[in-house]
Amino acid sequence: MALALLEDWCRIMSVDEQKSLMVTGIPVDYEEAEIQEVLQETLKSLGSYRLLGKIFRKQENANAVLLELLEDTDVSAIPSEVQGKGGVWKVVFKTPNQDTEFLERLNLFLEKEGQTVSGMFRALGHEGMSPATVPCISPELLAHLLGQAMAHAPQPLLPMRYRKLRVFSGSAVPAPEEEPFEVWLEQATEIVKEWPVTEAEKKRWLAESLRGPALDLMHIVQADNPSISVEECLEAFKQVFGSLESRRTAQVRYLKTYQEEGEKVSAYVLRLETLLRRAVEKRAIPRRIADQVRLEQVMAGATLNQMLWCRLRELKDQGPPPNFLELMKVIREEEEEEASFENESIEEPEEGDGYGGWNHEGDD
């Protein structure tokens, strides 16, 4: 970042970047005379120079200055930092071989990818470029063009690492390395969301983890619907390989869950919601009637006061049942109203309290 700033600044000032320095980290309250005093002392081995300008760098909350060296200087004599008043100032400069190093790294990178610089230019529509002209192009332009090439490259061709799924076959006798279906499905559902590729590539990666009947099912659902999504494929696996017993267990656990002693109705509904969603995921309860089932279970499994019972009964009779948040809002409002009423009852003085409650037996 600092080197790029040096190069841009030199272009603006029309000076040779190989004969220029940039000093950064200078406190903003330093005057030019104070800066010159420090630099003359610390850079005297470089010979004469002139200060071309000063800018403020917001990211450092400090100033930077550009210097032009007026004499030929050995780059090995240029310090990487100088001790200024109030801290260390960084010295940024460009070595003569940095452009060559960049080109070497670029060629090495493209070689590993099976490409060439000329091929990169052709892919971007720059047919006139040849290997002979590449050294004449600035590293900044090459870096920009390389970034374009990476951005336009087909996503599956880019080198990437991805979390692979464990093997699943769906066989009656699973292999020792296989996970139970429920464990595999939970892992697969999470991991496929992380894969930064197209749906087609996701389905290919999913198929790589399948064997036997599971792989056969994958081929069948794709043949029936070539545009099927990965999520729909996993849903098909649930229907075929999912445990029916686990569905019944989820349904019974939900229907047999009641409000516990001392538990608020809102806390019961929140606990119940986790079980309901699990039952819906296992297809033990149809998603389309989840709101209705929730309301009925709350009315059957909770201890409700008369006011809340009437409100819930009204919601059930009048129209579409409330969703989770709507139901929770009704219950919380009733709980707050009931708590407010109880507080008022406690604060209200009972008969015989106050000044009129004194014992006057001693009065005549």
From Swiss-Prot:
Organism domain of life: Eukaryota
Biased composition annotated in UniProt, kind: Acidic residues: 335-353
Name of the featured protein: Paraneoplastic antigen Ma2 homolog
InterPro entries noted in UniProt: PNMA, PNMA_C, PNMA_N
GO cellular component assignments: nucleolus
Main location: nucleus
Positions carrying N-acetylalanine: 2
Biased composition (Gly residues): 354-364
Pfam families xrefs: PNMA (PF14893), PNMA_N (PF20846)
Gene: PNMA2
Keywords noted in UniProt: Acetylation, Nucleus
Compartments where located: Nucleus, Nucleolus
Region (Disordered): 335-364
Family recorded in the similarity comment: Belongs to the PNMA family.
The organism of origin for this protein: Macaca fascicularis
Residues spanning the membrane: none
